[in-house]
């Protein structure tokens, strides 16, 4: 599989590709082999200023575009993504290290579907009216909030960009968006698609390190809203920056989700759900089912079979269609995951699968870690409480329904979770009792457009992938109309 991309990428400002104002650039590498992929512009404060100015000017006309026409724009974007699906999937795979089977079948088509979903939602959007009395009519309408600053992460660069761009454009907002400096290429390639579809300045893409270009976005007074996906630590900085200017922020942050398996679960479905919960996207998923709770009556058998399945997972070069687990994002993430393996041992848990880096052959050049299963863990261990963000799960034994609910909720986070059981009443009870924004029943990591996604507690604020997010990108306006031709009667007008 050969990749065809530019050697050098600029910033997309006002529908033009431009270099950074000071000429600064940074390199982008393939995490699977360490090879350089491209060079990207490092946006300066002046560049962000220009991008915001372009978005501000474009907003004057974009906000007046009809719902019908905005929906048509979104559909054109979706069709263009489909037309370039194979190319975009390759770019995402080389840039991020995730298997091509995931980018081709999940990331890219799901991104396109989000544009289609919001096009449909937009056509169905209505205001409301209320008659207070025979002479007073109240109209409620929603208007776009303005210029939005968006920052997307490295784990799902293309998909997270689609999650944020689609509702913002549907609402009538204009955007300045920044990808992670580790994974800038798929959004830049999307920029070339948007450049041919959208009016100038509606979407502007600035690239660079979060500590510089990202901070310029957080601090810029020209934004009416911020949207961020990433760690809870950085999310707090985003929230603080927004609060200091009294603007709203949508935050999708960290997680340490519980994946719960009762003794009556469908056996193969349960094993598959445990693997899907922690190995999809190399476990670099904010809602990964990294805490696996298994009922004591099936614990030993479940652990024995799951560990064998972990060992059978094909770790390979991400562009190989048979690869099931690809590369982690960069060297520091490898070291972080392996440090938790050692910590688990120190805390008294056992490693029954994986727990090591692949150092030989082609994979030795990249950031590959074998699927890792930690057993005999307890919920108070650091490995069960801290977000690791890799293909590593801890398995915790439980006895009763009440016990597992209490332990699952004993977490700073509340983003995702799963429950596997053939008892429908139990499934609903547990799903309702877990303090989390998304619960899966007898499945995991399904993220369709139209299903609201977001977190409780320190996992974020707001919901994405659902029409409710349009409320985050709009403001409510109320218009009171007097239908009478008579004065108020409060004053003597004669």
Segment roles from a protein language model:
Residues 127-269, 398:
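Rossmann-like NAD(P) dinucleotide-binding subdomain of oxidoreductase/dehydrogenase enzymes
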Residues 36-43, 58-64, 150, 259-262, ...:
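Short, well-ordered beta-strand elements within core beta-sheets of diverse protein domains
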Residues 35-125, 135:
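Glycine-rich loop-to-alpha-helix module at the N-terminal edge of alpha/beta enzyme cores
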Residues 1-32, 356:
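Hydrophobic face of amphipathic alpha-helices that form TPR/SEL1-like repeat modules
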Residues 34, 70, 92, 115, ...:
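Residue-level signal for inorganic ion chemistry
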Residues 33-39, 260, 314, 364-494:
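Conserved C-terminal structural/oligomerization subdomain of aldehyde/semialdehyde dehydrogenase
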Residues 233-377, 441, 488-494:
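ALDH superfamily catalytic-core signature
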